[in-house]
Design a protein with these regions (language model features):
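Conserved beta strand-loop-helix elements of the APE1-like EEP
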Residues: 1
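Polybasic, glycine- and aromatic-enriched phosphate-binding surface used to engage nucleic acids
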Residues: 5-6, 11-254
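Extended amphipathic alpha-helical segments enriched in small hydrophobics
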Residues: 248-277
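Acidic, turn-prone loop/beta-hairpin segments
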Residues: 280
Protein backbone atom coordinates (compact mmCIF):
# COMPACT_ATOMS: atom_id res chain seq x y z
CA UNK A 1 0.00 0.00 0.00
CA UNK A 2 2.78 2.43 0.90
CA UNK A 3 4.58 1.68 -2.39
CA UNK A 4 1.39 2.42 -4.33
CA UNK A 5 0.91 5.73 -2.51
CA UNK A 6 4.50 6.75 -3.23
CA UNK A 7 4.17 5.84 -6.92
CA UNK A 8 0.84 7.62 -7.40
CA UNK A 9 1.47 10.66 -5.20
CA UNK A 10 1.45 14.22 -6.54
CA UNK A 11 3.20 17.11 -4.86
CA UNK A 12 0.89 20.09 -4.40
CA UNK A 13 1.69 23.43 -2.82
CA UNK A 14 -1.06 25.05 -0.77
CA UNK A 15 0.18 28.56 -0.13
CA UNK A 16 -2.95 30.70 -0.32
CA UNK A 17 -6.29 30.94 1.43
CA UNK A 18 -8.07 29.74 -1.73
CA UNK A 19 -9.82 26.39 -1.89
CA UNK A 20 -7.44 23.46 -2.08
CA UNK A 21 -7.47 21.37 -5.24
CA UNK A 22 -5.22 18.42 -6.07
CA UNK A 23 -3.67 18.79 -9.53
CA UNK A 24 -1.03 16.91 -11.46
CA UNK A 25 2.23 18.74 -12.30
CA UNK A 26 1.04 19.65 -15.82
CA UNK A 27 -2.29 20.89 -14.42
CA UNK A 28 -0.51 22.99 -11.81
CA UNK A 29 1.62 24.53 -14.56
CA UNK A 30 -1.41 25.35 -16.71
CA UNK A 31 -3.24 26.91 -13.76
CA UNK A 32 -0.23 29.06 -12.83
CA UNK A 33 0.13 30.35 -16.40
CA UNK A 34 -3.55 31.25 -16.68
CA UNK A 35 -3.43 33.15 -13.39
CA UNK A 36 -0.17 34.94 -14.17
CA UNK A 37 -1.30 36.18 -17.60
CA UNK A 38 -5.01 36.88 -17.23
CA UNK A 39 -6.80 39.72 -15.47
CA UNK A 40 -9.61 38.59 -13.14
CA UNK A 41 -13.01 39.14 -14.71
CA UNK A 42 -14.00 41.43 -11.82
CA UNK A 43 -11.35 43.92 -13.01
CA UNK A 44 -12.78 44.21 -16.53
CA UNK A 45 -15.32 46.87 -15.49
CA UNK A 46 -18.24 44.48 -15.72
CA UNK A 47 -21.33 43.82 -13.64
CA UNK A 48 -22.92 40.44 -12.90
CA UNK A 49 -26.63 40.37 -12.12
CA UNK A 50 -28.91 37.53 -11.08
CA UNK A 51 -32.09 36.66 -12.96
CA UNK A 52 -35.59 37.44 -11.75
CA UNK A 53 -37.31 35.54 -8.96
CA UNK A 54 -41.07 35.88 -9.20
CA UNK A 55 -42.01 33.66 -6.27
CA UNK A 56 -44.76 32.09 -8.40
CA UNK A 57 -43.72 31.37 -11.98
CA UNK A 58 -47.08 29.88 -13.00
CA UNK A 59 -48.64 33.34 -12.76
CA UNK A 60 -45.78 35.57 -13.90
CA UNK A 61 -44.13 33.51 -16.65
CA UNK A 62 -46.50 32.82 -19.53
CA UNK A 63 -46.37 31.39 -23.03
CA UNK A 64 -47.07 33.28 -26.24
CA UNK A 65 -50.66 32.03 -26.40
CA UNK A 66 -51.43 33.44 -22.94
CA UNK A 67 -49.64 36.70 -23.77
CA UNK A 68 -51.79 37.12 -26.87
CA UNK A 69 -54.90 36.32 -24.86
CA UNK A 70 -54.04 39.02 -22.31
CA UNK A 71 -53.41 41.54 -25.08
CA UNK A 72 -56.70 40.61 -26.77
CA UNK A 73 -58.49 41.27 -23.47
CA UNK A 74 -57.22 44.85 -23.32
CA UNK A 75 -60.04 47.37 -23.68
CA UNK A 76 -58.15 50.09 -25.55
CA UNK A 77 -55.15 50.62 -27.79
CA UNK A 78 -53.49 52.54 -24.96
CA UNK A 79 -53.90 49.64 -22.53
CA UNK A 80 -52.70 47.18 -25.17
CA UNK A 81 -49.56 49.22 -25.84
CA UNK A 82 -48.75 49.62 -22.14
CA UNK A 83 -49.40 45.93 -21.49
CA UNK A 84 -47.17 44.83 -24.37
CA UNK A 85 -44.38 46.92 -22.88
CA UNK A 86 -44.90 45.25 -19.49
CA UNK A 87 -44.71 41.68 -20.82
CA UNK A 88 -41.13 40.87 -21.86
CA UNK A 89 -39.41 37.79 -23.36
CA UNK A 90 -37.55 35.68 -20.81
CA UNK A 91 -34.88 32.98 -20.84
CA UNK A 92 -34.28 30.14 -18.40
CA UNK A 93 -30.96 28.52 -17.58
CA UNK A 94 -31.81 25.48 -19.71
CA UNK A 95 -32.28 27.76 -22.74
CA UNK A 96 -28.68 29.00 -22.69
CA UNK A 97 -26.33 27.38 -25.20
CA UNK A 98 -22.76 28.08 -26.20
CA UNK A 99 -22.84 31.23 -28.39
CA UNK A 100 -26.63 31.23 -28.52
CA UNK A 101 -29.93 30.39 -26.88
CA UNK A 102 -33.16 28.56 -27.66
CA UNK A 103 -35.96 30.87 -26.59
CA UNK A 104 -38.94 28.79 -25.45
CA UNK A 105 -41.55 31.44 -26.36
CA UNK A 106 -41.94 32.41 -22.72
CA UNK A 107 -42.76 35.87 -21.41
CA UNK A 108 -42.43 37.61 -18.07
CA UNK A 109 -45.05 39.87 -16.56
CA UNK A 110 -42.37 42.27 -15.37
CA UNK A 111 -44.12 44.07 -12.52
CA UNK A 112 -40.89 44.93 -10.70
CA UNK A 113 -41.48 46.69 -7.37
CA UNK A 114 -38.78 49.21 -8.23
CA UNK A 115 -40.90 50.37 -11.19
CA UNK A 116 -43.88 51.32 -8.97
CA UNK A 117 -46.60 50.11 -11.34
CA UNK A 118 -50.27 50.88 -10.76
CA UNK A 119 -52.02 47.58 -11.49
CA UNK A 120 -55.29 49.44 -12.12
CA UNK A 121 -53.70 50.73 -15.34
CA UNK A 122 -53.39 47.12 -16.55
CA UNK A 123 -56.87 45.55 -16.16
CA UNK A 124 -56.13 42.55 -18.42
CA UNK A 125 -52.94 41.74 -16.51
CA UNK A 126 -54.75 42.18 -13.20
CA UNK A 127 -57.49 39.76 -14.29
CA UNK A 128 -54.90 37.18 -15.33
CA UNK A 129 -53.06 37.38 -12.01
CA UNK A 130 -56.25 37.27 -9.95
CA UNK A 131 -57.22 34.04 -11.73
CA UNK A 132 -54.57 32.36 -9.53
CA UNK A 133 -56.10 33.80 -6.37
CA UNK A 134 -54.95 36.94 -4.61
CA UNK A 135 -54.14 34.99 -1.45
CA UNK A 136 -51.64 32.88 -3.38
CA UNK A 137 -49.94 35.97 -4.82
CA UNK A 138 -49.73 37.99 -1.60
CA UNK A 139 -46.22 38.45 -0.26
CA UNK A 140 -47.06 37.82 3.37
CA UNK A 141 -45.89 34.24 3.98
CA UNK A 142 -49.35 33.45 5.38
CA UNK A 143 -51.34 30.25 4.91
CA UNK A 144 -55.03 30.16 3.94
CA UNK A 145 -57.66 27.46 3.72
CA UNK A 146 -59.72 27.95 0.56
CA UNK A 147 -62.35 25.38 -0.45
CA UNK A 148 -60.72 22.94 1.96
CA UNK A 149 -57.29 23.36 0.38
CA UNK A 150 -54.32 24.95 2.12
CA UNK A 151 -52.90 27.83 0.10
CA UNK A 152 -49.58 29.41 1.01
CA UNK A 153 -48.78 32.96 -0.03
CA UNK A 154 -45.37 33.93 -1.34
CA UNK A 155 -42.65 34.66 1.20
CA UNK A 156 -43.02 37.81 3.27
CA UNK A 157 -41.70 40.99 1.65
CA UNK A 158 -42.81 44.60 1.52
CA UNK A 159 -43.90 44.18 -2.11
CA UNK A 160 -47.46 44.24 -3.41
CA UNK A 161 -49.44 41.17 -4.42
CA UNK A 162 -49.11 41.81 -8.16
CA UNK A 163 -45.36 42.50 -8.09
CA UNK A 164 -42.46 40.11 -8.60
CA UNK A 165 -40.78 38.84 -5.45
CA UNK A 166 -37.43 40.55 -6.10
CA UNK A 167 -37.26 44.32 -6.43
CA UNK A 168 -34.76 44.26 -9.36
CA UNK A 169 -33.22 47.72 -9.55
CA UNK A 170 -31.36 46.95 -12.80
CA UNK A 171 -34.30 47.06 -15.24
CA UNK A 172 -32.27 49.04 -17.78
CA UNK A 173 -29.56 46.35 -17.93
CA UNK A 174 -31.94 43.94 -19.66
CA UNK A 175 -32.03 46.38 -22.58
CA UNK A 176 -28.22 46.46 -22.94
CA UNK A 177 -25.85 44.01 -24.66
CA UNK A 178 -25.19 41.21 -22.19
CA UNK A 179 -23.74 37.73 -21.70
CA UNK A 180 -26.17 35.12 -20.38
CA UNK A 181 -25.09 31.96 -18.58
CA UNK A 182 -26.89 29.33 -16.53
CA UNK A 183 -26.66 28.96 -12.76
CA UNK A 184 -25.98 25.21 -13.06
CA UNK A 185 -24.38 23.75 -16.18
CA UNK A 186 -22.67 20.62 -17.50
CA UNK A 187 -20.16 22.78 -19.36
CA UNK A 188 -19.55 26.52 -19.45
CA UNK A 189 -21.98 28.06 -21.93
CA UNK A 190 -22.03 31.82 -22.46
CA UNK A 191 -24.03 33.66 -25.11
CA UNK A 192 -24.07 37.30 -26.07
CA UNK A 193 -27.48 38.89 -26.52
CA UNK A 194 -27.92 42.41 -27.86
CA UNK A 195 -31.72 42.26 -27.95
CA UNK A 196 -34.11 43.11 -25.13
CA UNK A 197 -34.27 39.87 -23.18
CA UNK A 198 -34.98 39.11 -19.53
CA UNK A 199 -33.97 35.99 -17.58
CA UNK A 200 -35.22 34.08 -14.56
CA UNK A 201 -33.34 33.14 -11.42
CA UNK A 202 -31.68 30.08 -12.95
CA UNK A 203 -29.60 32.46 -15.01
CA UNK A 204 -26.98 35.17 -14.55
CA UNK A 205 -25.96 37.86 -16.99
CA UNK A 206 -22.93 40.11 -17.46
CA UNK A 207 -23.03 43.71 -18.67
CA UNK A 208 -19.99 45.86 -19.36
CA UNK A 209 -19.28 49.57 -19.37
CA UNK A 210 -17.71 48.95 -22.79
CA UNK A 211 -20.04 46.46 -24.55
CA UNK A 212 -17.34 45.75 -27.15
CA UNK A 213 -15.48 43.54 -24.67
CA UNK A 214 -18.43 41.15 -24.37
CA UNK A 215 -17.50 39.35 -27.59
CA UNK A 216 -13.97 38.79 -26.26
CA UNK A 217 -15.33 37.54 -22.94
CA UNK A 218 -17.75 35.23 -24.75
CA UNK A 219 -14.93 33.78 -26.82
CA UNK A 220 -12.70 33.15 -23.79
CA UNK A 221 -15.35 31.86 -21.41
CA UNK A 222 -16.67 29.33 -23.94
CA UNK A 223 -13.33 27.56 -24.37
CA UNK A 224 -12.43 24.13 -23.06
CA UNK A 225 -9.44 25.74 -21.35
CA UNK A 226 -11.53 28.08 -19.21
CA UNK A 227 -14.07 25.32 -18.58
CA UNK A 228 -11.23 23.22 -17.15
CA UNK A 229 -9.83 26.15 -15.15
CA UNK A 230 -13.21 27.03 -13.63
CA UNK A 231 -13.53 23.49 -12.27
CA UNK A 232 -10.35 24.07 -10.25
CA UNK A 233 -12.18 26.92 -8.48
CA UNK A 234 -15.78 25.85 -8.11
CA UNK A 235 -17.58 22.97 -6.45
CA UNK A 236 -18.62 20.20 -8.83
CA UNK A 237 -22.11 18.70 -8.67
CA UNK A 238 -22.32 15.02 -9.53
CA UNK A 239 -20.05 13.87 -12.34
CA UNK A 240 -19.91 16.99 -14.53
CA UNK A 241 -22.18 19.83 -13.43
CA UNK A 242 -20.90 22.98 -11.74
CA UNK A 243 -22.54 25.93 -9.99
CA UNK A 244 -21.66 29.29 -11.48
CA UNK A 245 -21.19 31.19 -8.24
CA UNK A 246 -20.21 34.81 -8.87
CA UNK A 247 -17.42 34.61 -6.29
CA UNK A 248 -15.68 32.14 -8.64
CA UNK A 249 -16.77 33.55 -12.01
CA UNK A 250 -15.41 36.98 -11.08
CA UNK A 251 -11.99 35.44 -10.46
CA UNK A 252 -11.59 33.79 -13.87
CA UNK A 253 -8.40 35.30 -15.40
CA UNK A 254 -9.10 36.74 -18.86
CA UNK A 255 -6.20 37.61 -21.24
CA UNK A 256 -6.00 40.87 -23.15
CA UNK A 257 -8.12 41.19 -26.29
CA UNK A 258 -6.42 39.45 -29.22
CA UNK A 259 -7.23 37.19 -32.17
CA UNK A 260 -4.50 34.75 -31.13
CA UNK A 261 -5.47 31.29 -29.81
CA UNK A 262 -6.22 31.33 -26.11
CA UNK A 263 -3.53 28.74 -25.34
CA UNK A 264 -0.98 31.02 -27.00
CA UNK A 265 -2.16 34.05 -25.05
CA UNK A 266 -1.72 32.17 -21.79
CA UNK A 267 1.70 30.89 -22.86
CA UNK A 268 0.83 27.19 -22.75
CA UNK A 269 3.36 24.74 -24.11
CA UNK A 270 2.50 22.31 -26.90
CA UNK A 271 2.14 19.45 -24.43
CA UNK A 272 -0.10 21.57 -22.18
CA UNK A 273 -2.29 22.52 -25.14
CA UNK A 274 -2.61 18.86 -26.12
CA UNK A 275 -3.56 17.99 -22.56
CA UNK A 276 -6.48 20.44 -22.64
CA UNK A 277 -7.50 19.42 -26.19
CA UNK A 278 -7.67 15.77 -25.14
CA UNK A 279 -9.99 16.41 -22.22
CA UNK A 280 -13.46 14.86 -22.64
Amino acid sequence: MSDFVQQQSVECRFESSDSWVILSPIEQSIKRKIESVGTPLKDWDIQINYGIKTGFNDAFIINTEKRNEILDNCCSDEERTKTAELIRPILRGRDIKRYGYNWADLWLIATFPSRHYDIEMYPAVKAHLLSFGKERLEQTGKKYIINGEEIKARKKTSNKWFETQDSISYWDDFFKPKLFYADITQKLNFCRCDEVMFCNNTTYFITAKNPNILTHLERCLNTKLIDWYYRTLSVQLGENAVRMFSIYVLNIPIPNISDMPLATLYGLSESESRYIDNLP
